[in-house]
Amino acid sequence: MTSLALTTAVKRIVSAAALAMAVVVTLELAFGYGATTAIPSIVQWTCMIAAYIMGAFWWFGPWPTLGQAFAFVVIANFAIFSATITADFAPEVTLGKCAFLIPIGMLAGFFFDKWRLATHIALCLLGTTIVAVYIVVERGVDTFVAVVLWAPIVISFTGFALLLQATTQSMRLEFE
């Protein structure tokens, strides 16, 4: 993976994305938007701590192997969905927090093969759809509003990742 990037810049960007996720959850907890029952609180705290650890790993750690980077993407996907669905926010904010998937998808689109990228996209589609259904069923949001919120997020994390994948593949073919 190292031959394809300015490793320090990529590490800092991915670290900043992970740390931003952690800071958002920290602020949720500090300002009373955290989960209000025991199990969701544990989930939220676990996701926050995991995001801080992942951010520190990307900032201070060595360049990850492909397996480590893929594990990061999968764990980050689950952490984003778990922290999102357990927070006590307005429904629009709840679904909007899925936008954290965009930088994760860009990492996947640039560095991963099509199967790892497909796994990331499938997890994102599933998780974002679950969040959208949740805000309709549990929070009483109109279905149309949920779709209007859901669609740009899905298009963004899918589109950016696929565009980067296509660009990367064409660049690799040029140099073969």
Enumerate the language-model features and the residues they cover.
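Juxtamembrane or sensor-core-proximal signal-transducing alpha helices
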Residues: 59, 148-176
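Hydrophobic transmembrane alpha-helices and their membrane-interface boundaries in multi-pass
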Residues: 12-92, 97-105
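Central hydrophobic cores of alpha-helical transmembrane segments
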Residues: 71-77, 118-130
